């Protein structure tokens, strides 16, 4: 595995790989890698001749009161995870390398961002789309891999890749969970012991909702209230949102039918966790 820290060197390598016809699997991350990221890397390894991993904590996607400075970082750990999962190139640029001058152009996402995390974090997805446009141009991937824990992000990325005719296939990968159901996340380290015991109820509430939908419930409001009540009963967290939309359009629905997403965000004392399930409403 080779570690690359400059845009120029990374572009030179991927241009040569692209010219030789080799397939490139790309996994963009903000580091502090866990089993969820490892799953993305293994899938990329299975499906491509070359695997490129990026580790970059992107300041553009953090708001003024968010956890940019507190976001966990451990490049030694990330290097080990990368090596163990078959990464060929680890792209690890600095903020100054990625943004050497004041940004004069950003990618403004106008659909799929006014709900869920997009509603709570204005400007977040513009930051995500902007850095991905740069990373796609730098790494020239055949396929790019994203976890469905950030399902809204996947929907936004699929939309902007289509809109800009970017020649990359977006590969969504199922959420990886702890044994008790908690979605793996770099931010889980901020949970207190008590909160860690409560946190699996996020997924538990989604499972209860799924059972009700499969039993025939078609009223979104009833399902959302069921989720909120479960979380409020079994955790001390505050429900940021518990919403149900068509997926991937993220349009509001009056009746549960077709492919839908049920997504939640819960604020604990020092961390905000998200989770979701997608399913087909009959």
Swiss-Prot record:
GO terms for molecular function: ATP binding; pantoate-beta-alanine ligase activity. Pfam families: Pantoate_ligase (PF02569). The active site is at residue 37. SUPFAM superfamilies: Nucleotidylyl transferase (SSF52374). It is found in: Cytoplasm. It catalyses: (R)-pantoate + beta-alanine + ATP = (R)-pantothenate + AMP + diphosphate + H(+). One of its GO terms (biological process) is pantothenate biosynthetic process. Beta-alanine binds at residue 61. Keywords: ATP-binding, Cytoplasm, Ligase, Nucleotide-binding, Pantothenate biosynthesis. (R)-pantoate binds at residues 61, 153. It comes from the Bacteria. The reaction proceeds by a bi uni uni bi ping pong mechanism. NCBIfam families: cyt_tran_rel, panC. Homodimer. Catalyzes the condensation of pantoate with beta-alanine in an ATP-dependent reaction via a pantoyl-adenylate intermediate. PANTHER family: CYTIDYLATE KINASE/PANTOATE-BETA-ALANINE LIGASE, PANTOATE--BETA-ALANINE LIGASE. Belongs to the pantothenate synthetase family. This is Pantothenate synthetase. It comes from Bacillus mycoides (strain KBAB4).
